[in-house]
UniProtKB/Swiss-Prot annotation:
Protein name as catalogued: Porin-like protein BUsg_347
Function comment: Forms pores that allow passive diffusion of small molecules across the membrane.
Keyword Disulfide bond (UniProt): no
A Pfam match: Porin_1
Species this chain originates from: Buchnera aphidicola subsp. Schizaphis graminum (strain Sg)
A GO CC term attached to the entry: pore complex
SUPFAM superfamilies xrefs: Porins
Signal peptide range: 1-23
Any single biological process term in GO: monoatomic ion transmembrane transport
S-S pairs: none
GO molecular function: porin activity
Subunit structure, as described in the record: Homotrimer.
Annotated localization: Cell outer membrane
Keyword flag Transmembrane: yes
């Protein structure tokens, strides 16, 4: 793979995260609420070799996201809630889209909440590691290749069959401290290697202060069932923990995340039961918000892995610097530019797993609701 520079023109006309901060309120009466949020993201990439004006490749990743979140008041303290988030890709011919159904349900869960006793829900949701890792996801248009952002990989990113209990302020007794407990039941085809995984448990603890400081710690453990012809393999459990910190006050946003995992990511996507023994992930971001509406930021990502089956003891999974800025016209409309400097160097592992080594320039206009 040649080291080349990629120009990505990203123009999301409607953007909103799953938190639905600027969601459209469809219904709100007597404590019952229904909100709609969504995005449509035209995304086209232009790639060319370094210092060359000739375009070597083009790629269309246009997609749309639509979500609904609702709440129903049952009693003064008891309420039910649900959320579903749906994604569709629009870069395939219509005939193929009808046959292959390139659609994705990103989120889909429902639950109950009772006063200070907390909430409990079940379905497709975020794993507890996301509680800590999300602190460095402050700039949504940066596409980080973090191993702790992969979906359908145990309790990392989004996954299904998650039973989640959350409690804010420790039953109303301690302000600023919240915790979560999570259980994932056994199911086939859960992880990236299309294997079978047994049940697992996870937890997270969060502290927030009035001064803008936040600290989050998350962890999970799960047993992986390997194939019958590999029963002699050791360390079949999948374990991970993450620590996240942020400061958000006085126009300054600074956050960092450290994550460590064992047997989490496949070393070779084409070989069953081949996993990186240990992975470490470091992320950091700093942003300053000017009163005029400009928000320049600088972020860093470094993911490394260790595998006894690899000729190299330490493998670079991702390494990048992002230099970004955005300008907010108002709470709904903003424009941005991002330059990603990819620090990865070509080797057998990167070629084998088709990990990109190109630099990327992204620019776009965002309208969010």
């Amino acid at each position: 793979m040649k080291n080349h520079k990629s120009l990505a023109i990203l123009i999301p006309m409607l953007f909103a995260g799953s938190t639905a901060v600027n969601a459209i309120e469809i219904f709100n009466k007597n404590g019952n609420k229904l909100e709609l949020y969504g995005s449509i993201n035209p995304n086209h990439n232009f790639s060319n070799e370094f210092l060359s004006t000739k375009i070597s490749s083009k790629e269309d990743n246009t997609n749309a996201i639509l979500g609904l979140s609702g709440k129903i008041k049952i009693t003064d303290k008891l309420s039910s809630y649900a959320q579903i988030e749906y994604k569709n890709n629009f870069f395939m011919p219509e005939d193929l889209m009808n046959k292959q159904q390139p659609n994705t349900v990103r989120l889909g869960y429902a639950g109950l909440k009772y006063g200070n006793l907390g909430s409990i829900d079940y379905g497709r949701n975020y794993g507890v590691i996301h509680d800590a890792q999300s602190l460095t996801d402050h700039v949504p248009y940066i596409n980080k290749k973090s191993i702790f952002a992969y979906n359908d990989n145990y309790m990392v990113g989004r996954n299904h069959s998650l039973l989640t209990y959350r409690n804010n302020n420790v039953f109303g007794l301690v302000d600023g401290i919240s915790f979560a407990l999570q259980y994932q039941d056994e199911i086939k085809n859960r992880d990236l290697n299309k294997g079978k995984s047994s049940s697992g448990w996870g937890a997270s603890l969060k502290y927030e202060s009035d001064s803008g400081l936040t600290a989050v710690g998350s962890c999970f453990t799960s047993e992986r069932m390997i194939s019958s012809n590999k029963k002699d393999l050791k360390n079949t459990s999948v374990d991970s923990y993450g620590l996240g910190f942020k400061y958000d006050a006085n126009n300054v946003y600074v956050a960092a995340f450290y994550g460590s995992a064992r047997n989490l990511m496949p070393y070779n996507m084409h070989i069953s039961d081949s996993f990186i023994n240990e992975t470490q992930n470091i992320e950091a971001i700093a942003e300053y918000s000017f009163d005029s509406g400009f928000h320049p930021s600088l972020s860093y990502l470094d993911s490394k892995g260790q595998n006894s089956n690899s000729p190299k003891k330490e493998l670079d999974l991702a390494k990048q610097i992002n230099i970004s800025t955005r300008y907010e016209f108002n709470k709904n409309v903003s424009t941005y530019m991002n330059y990603k400097i990819n620090l990865l160097k070509e080797n057998d592992f990167i070629s084998q797993n088709q990990i990109p080594t190109d630099n990327t320039i992204g620019a776009g206009v965002v309208y969010q609701f």
